[in-house]
Amino acid sequence: MWNVIISFSMGLVLGNVIPGESCFHLMIKKTLFEQVVLIFLFSGGLLLTYRRVNLFNYCPFNDLKIITLSLLVLQITDEFFLVICSFLFFSEIRLRAIVCRCMLIFPTHSMASYFGTLIAIVLKISDLVHYRLLVTVFLITPYVTSYKFLVNSHQFAMCLQRYKPIYKPNGPYQMAIKDVIVYLLQFLTLTLLVWFGKLYLPRKSCQHLFFLAVLHSNLFITKLYQLVLCSILCLLAGVITEHCFFSLLFEFFLGLGYSALFAQISKTVGRKDIFTGDLLNLFYCSACFVIFF
């Protein structure tokens, strides 16, 4: 039963990040040359997506930089059409690659994942605003329900070996399930704050500042609970005063919070746990759904 639920969840997420869909409407009224270049960029991005990745030395910046640049160029005028499309393709294909990797690792039920993909595409075409939250929940569900089982299962190990040989000679290190729950609760706290900010703050979109904050370095020596507290104070101040300055501060502290969480996971178990890379990809991919949609 869990196998079917997990497969359906992955199919739902996969259908939501079909590559290039949001860009093809830009091809209307474009020259033939621009359309050819667009398809060429799409094909090149698809090939570059599946490059070799070392999960034992995971760096969130490698995933952040593509989508950060895509957000930045989205604000440019239509004269930079090809640049915009290229970054959009890279960002969407990267998200799709993350989900496809999860589907390779998990023991998926093909028919359930197929129907999940179809339903997600129908919802996307119907332009239902609130179903994005449902997609985010489904993305988190398999990791919560089957983490320990998957790490211990032989099929999980075989899928990982077939996809990329990332096992160390002395065998894998298993992260304690309580550590996963702690990280998950911290991530959900930050994500709930993002939703509250999107609902109640006067400035609904501050992705530029948010992702500049996510490119957080060791210059900021702060605890996660301090960043959460500062974010809550900025959220309350922004709701009361309705001033955009507090919205910018809110996004800044949230960005630092996400970055601190990623850095903490990577530093603590990044070189030992075979599942850390996918856990970080899960968190980051979920944050993208919440922030962008």
Curated annotation (Swiss-Prot):
Subcellular location, record wording:
Membrane
Keywords of this protein's UniProt record, alphabetized?
Membrane, Transmembrane, Transmembrane helix
Q: Transmembrane stretches, by residue range? A: 4-24, 30-50, 71-91, 103-123, 133-153, 180-200, 220-240, 245-265, 273-293
Which branch of life, at top level? Viruses
Q: How does it sit in the membrane?
A: Multi-pass membrane protein
Alphabetical GO CC annotations of the entry are: membrane
Keyword Plastid tagged = no
Instruction: One Pfam family, please name it.
Output: Herpes_U26
What this protein is called in its record is Protein U26
> What is the organism of origin for this protein?
Human herpesvirus 7 (strain JI)
User: Gene symbol?
Assistant: U26
